[in-house]
Amino acid sequence: MQGQGMDSMFAMEELSLMGIAEILPKYRHLKRRIRETADAVIAAKPDVLITIDSPDFCLRVARLVKAGSNVRTVHYVAPTVWAWRAGRAEKMARHIDHVLALFPFETPFMQAAGMDCDFVGHPVAAEPPVTPDELRAFDEKYGLGRGTECMVILPGSRRSEVERMGPIFGQTFAQADLG
């Protein structure tokens, strides 16, 4: 988004934390960033606040914005309330007006909690399927024969997550029987 002209109030790396061990030492700083962000939104008086993913940060900002203004709130990427902590949807509905969901089955969960919700699709799911020619080219490029098993390791996007989980993924890969 910065590449498209958005000015960020701070580096997003400040929020790329996982687990209590990373969050606790920075708790006060994170609380300050939430307050600063909410105050900036309230001062700007936008027609709508659109928050994107990062529910632990964004939903706290939205709560403060709703408490201090009449700004409509839209959240892109529904939290996985269908998988765990279902009560989050009802809490979220107190300060989120509309949700843009990645998956069609999320819409009823959000609506049942009291939010408007539209299924907008997942960027990866929108990709066209691989063609047989592309699959053959991939097999040839990497020396795979037809029917060869292939393991894909997707460690995540946060540096701390990759650093922490990388060795575990490596051990898992080493133990995998791909024969």
Please place each PLM-identified region on the residue numbering.
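Active-site and donor-binding regions of nucleotide-sugar-utilizing enzymes
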Residues: 1-139, 154-162
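Active-site donor-nucleotide binding/catalytic segment of nucleotide-sugar enzymes
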Residues: 137-179
